[in-house]
């Protein structure tokens, strides 16, 4: 084998090993965040509110689009495009009820129209709050900023989306349904819903969080969400056609639970993609493998830093939430903070309030360093000690030196004294 081939194989093996190491860190981190943020419960809440707000929201959107006479011309094409590509099953039944409900909103008086607008705004606000909760953004948007965002979504959003759908539908019915190479062009156009889904998820992850999101992270999350969305469509269609449970139980009313279930799946996909984007930016990017200098109290300082921040927040009435603490906890990475918090909770040194915030569950004037040190598992004591900095911890360094000296004096004895030797063997 050539030296170049050997070198390439070594580089490939190194990259594969680094990838596996990253996945071992990333996947558990994402799963814990997924469970902590109660994504499935949040998706159910959003699905219920979406079901209630869907008709008011679409009524507002269509009223904006109806300002342009062009939309009326292509309304049927847009209708076909939407229900053929984004509603996987029972589309005809849903379409019939959908446009009937939309038509009923035209007779709503002015006060009722304002109420519909408020319901639509509440849905957008809930989506904004849920996505920002994943990033643990607790600072609310400024009133003017929030109003501008929501109003833009309700006005410019429909215009942009509507124009795109009109163009897509026009191309579908005038260019791709006749002429040569029909099969090839139809196959190319079949990817258009994927592009639309990708753009929708990308904008959701890039613009909605009131937090800096890296472009590549948003793109990666959009790819994942689009792929999950397509899988959900296939699975949902298979389920409805194979196991007609809802239709058997509810009959003509089955459209309601079916629509709710489909909206629920969409929100599970969207929030899962948001968790993925968040975790890409929050998880530890690399595992430091270099050998560190021996330290008797290694890892203890990170634990003290976590408890200190919780105690300070408790004193000033600004309780600490996990993710906020994980990202601002003096440089300690999120996975390590999670482990520390779990140990402190298990030993009843801290507890979680009803609002999901942390508070000390012990008297720091009575609990000693030895009490704390004795409960820490090995994985905590081999941490990075990223929190050690500044003059505040000088006394801890002095304590560590004293403990190391005492330990060295006690252990400064040959191994032969403690290794059992058989009789007759030379000592």
Swiss-Prot record:
A Pfam match: Virul_fac_BrkB
Predominant cellular place of this UniProt entry's protein: membrane
Transmembrane helix as UniProt keyword: yes
Localization per record: Cell inner membrane
GO CC terms, sorted: plasma membrane
HAMAP family, alphabetized: UPF0761
Family assignment from sequence similarity: Belongs to the UPF0761 family.
Protein name (record): UPF0761 membrane protein Cphamn1_1013
Organism: Chlorobium phaeobacteroides (strain BS1)
